[in-house]
Amino acid sequence: MSKLKKRKGDEGESIASNFLISLDHEILKRNYRFLHCEIDIISVKEEVLYFSEVKFWKEFKFFDPRFTFNLAKQTKMRKAAKGFLAENLSFQNHFVSFCLVSVNEKKGCKYYLDLF
């Protein structure tokens, strides 16, 4: 991954983390890796565990960012979530939500819950 792409991703994840904190989420992990799978942000609010993908665009895009969740991405997120739950047994009884935080430099953040 290029340094520019990594820096852009880190910036988007920082904005998304602050956005989730403003919604009373507790951030548990950022860039959680399990095998070859990654989840950008893992957070918890009440009894729900949120596994969130972050998409960051500097300019406005005329498409629905939820379409970035193809079957391969869903499979990898599920695998990473199972790994996190196996490593963190205290969250075994929480509800789980797979989400997207779309970050646009001009429009702010939009949060999509329960995508799959």
Swiss-Prot record:
Pfam families: UPF0102. One of its GO terms (molecular function) is nucleic acid binding. InterPro entries: Restrct_endonuc-II-like (IPR011335), tRNA_endonuc-like_dom_sf (IPR011856), UPF0102_YraN-like (IPR003509). PANTHER family: UPF0102 PROTEIN YRAN (PTHR34039:SF1). Belongs to the UPF0102 family. This is UPF0102 protein LA_2381. The lineage of its organism: Bacteria, Pseudomonadati, Spirochaetota, Spirochaetia, Leptospirales.
